Amino acid sequence: MSKENMSNEGKCPFNHGAAGTNQSSGRGTSNKDWWPNQLNLNILHQHSPKSNPMGEDFDYAKEFNSLDLEAIRQDLFALMTDSQDWWPADYGHYGPFFIRMAWHSAGTYRTADGRGGATSGTQRFAPLNSWPDNVNLDKARRLLWPIKQKYGRKISWADLMILAGNCALESMGFKTFGFAGGRVDVWQPEEDIYWGTEKTWLDDERYTGDRELENPLAAVQMGLIYVNPEGPEGKPDTLASARDIRDTFGRMAMNDEETVALIAGGHTFGKAHGAGDAAQVGADPEAAGIAEQGFGWSNSMGTGKGVDTISSGLEGAWTKSPIAWDNGYFENLFEYDWELTKSPAGAWQWTPKDGAAANSVPDAHDSSKRHAPIMFTSDLALRDDPIYAPISKRFYENPDQLADAFARAWFKLTHRDMGPVARYLGPLVPQEELVWQDPIPAVTYVTVNDQDILDLKAKIQASGLTVAQLVSTAWASASTYRGSDMRGGANGARIRLAPQKDWAVNQPEQLAKVLSVLESIQAEFNRQDSTKQVSLADLIVLGGSVGVEQAAKASGHSVTVPFTAGRADASQEQTDVESFAFLEPAADGFRNYLKGKYTVSAEEMLVDRAQLLTLSAPEMTALLGGLRVLNANVGQSQHGVFTDKPETLSNDFFVNLLDMGTKWFATSEEEEEFQGRDRTTGKIKWTATRADLVFGSNSQLRAIAEVYACSDSQERFVKDFIAAWTKVMELDRFDLA
């Protein structure tokens, strides 16, 4: 070896800095290290086409609709009993394993923000692929790989994992409620999801007070899907466990009956794995060495698989027939008295007292061995809790009711985050309308044409409603949309129904006035021709278009805001009030609204809202600046209305925000509201909130604001505002391919 080579040995090969320093791409001290509280705008630019190997023209719906669904189902049925030496199937059947995989893919969903769930296939990526609750599910996905490889682009990983769970149930004698495709894979972790602040797996710093779980979280510990099966904090208290179950399953949109059905149905199958000390289990997939090729949790006990498998740490099966649908779960739960014991791994679990049923359960891999059934603390909670107990007893006595409830709850679990039925694909979609799907009536009439739209616009313009009223009402209707679970939006006109009509952010008194005027216009139009109708949902959005067009005209721009009819009006009976309550914004920075005081800053909540609306940073900037000058704040607040000509679509917000003649001062120690004073005279010129000033404070947002503040940017601003506005108005138009 030459002296030159010897002198370079062990040094970094990348010339990004001084020779020999460790500055390869992506390493080194980051901005986040220097400024940990820096506003995270990266969540607005996730899932770039550059990260997607399928290409921008890839149409997954088209590909899925060309899939031979029955053929892939038969392949999945065959896989269930095709045990592999590298990961042998318990009881010779992979069904329970795939149920757990599908459940844990879907079970991260939470109602508070609609994030998590199965719809993006993110169990493939960190952190989910390495959560303690997902131990060994890397093997389940590898078992599926030959099928994924065979069918390629015709089925996403997200759909395949759920379909495998359905086929697993069916292969063991259970009749499922249905299956819908349509889940589109992402190609990187979802950075917008808040999983908690804990730095250690299974920590539970998310609780305060009397075990109050932090919002929007829906799991008791970092790295768990729901609850600790041993009991809260590992303590085998069944009633305390029931409280955790009710809280976490409720946050995942399940009521008490659905919760009991899911736990009982899921635990009818398979077994838990805790053959030995968890210290024998190696690094998770994300931390494992490169030679492991994405496999994690290497187990040094015995063969490291089969009888030696260590996953949850609990050990055993719930029923005597772990690969068949029956009523064995409730039979065991109610027909035995249970005593506390520990698994070989040291985890708390329960077995029948006095050795009862000691040989009723077959061994998963050795036909010469028999075992007693086991229950988790979270299972006995279904017997001991005063609310769960009668539900459990009813299912025990009426197995047909359990079967129906589990089928429906499983379908809800695995489809809750897919949005409305309009997004469902395939021949197995059930026909029954379910209220949690936020149903909207089909459009069975002729919709308005171009001339009708012009006539309706003229009537709205002559109605006496102001630009601010029209714009704020349309925004209130459409901006409930959440890209996380595809709920909300203008379609359905649910803004006229409970609970949305009563939300403070929607200014109920003004809203009622605007809706009354629009309903009169709707009624007059619909009386003319019974075959041609306009929905209130369409009219609300069209009213917003009128407001924007009038405001643009006032600034010297003649524009037409794109509008496509076809929305329908949902009924109150089609609207689950309790479920829709989760869509009420705690904050809407676009309307300068805060419902209360929060530990999260107003600007962070603005970015979070923008992310749920699938907006980019430029779209967020253009929209907020436009809504301010259109006077669309809640309560007509003048915070951020940096213009002397409100209801005119100008770039004044940006021009005046960046004016160095203004100096800003907080009005209190909380630094939530501010006054902008003339630097020379000290006279108050403007007032603002953090959601306004962040566009001058944050360097990235200021750079965008500067674009719109330039003297040659007025036309560009109007164009960009209208494009972003139209995007929000159509976010829930899944009928517009």
From Swiss-Prot:
Region span, Disordered: 1-32
Gene Ontology BP, a term: cellular response to hydrogen peroxide
SUPFAM superfamilies, alphabetized: Heme-dependent peroxidases
Classification via InterPro entries: Catalase_peroxidase, Haem_peroxidase, Haem_peroxidase_sf, Peroxidases_AS, Peroxidases_heam-ligand_BS
Keywords: Heme, Hydrogen peroxide, Iron, Metal-binding, Oxidoreductase, Peroxidase
Residues binding heme b: 267
Transmembrane annotation, as ranges: none
Reaction catalysed by this enzyme: H2O2 + AH2 = A + 2 H2O; 2 H2O2 = O2 + 2 H2O
Cofactor (UniProt): heme b
Positions bearing the site annotation: Transition state stabilizer: 100
Cross-link (Tryptophyl-tyrosyl-methioninium (Trp-Tyr) (with M-252)): 103-226
Location of cross-link Tryptophyl-tyrosyl-methioninium (Tyr-Met) (with W-103): 226-252
One GO CC term on file: cytosol
Bias type Polar residues, positions: 20-32
Protein modification: Formation of the three residue Trp-Tyr-Met cross-link is important for the catalase, but not the peroxidase activity of the enzyme.
Cofactor note as given: Binds 1 heme b (iron(II)-protoporphyrin IX) group per dimer.
Active-site annotation: 104 (proton acceptor)
Entry function: Bifunctional enzyme with both catalase and broad-spectrum peroxidase activity.
Quaternary assembly: Homodimer or homotetramer.
Protein name as it appears in the record: Catalase-peroxidase
Gene (UniProt): katG
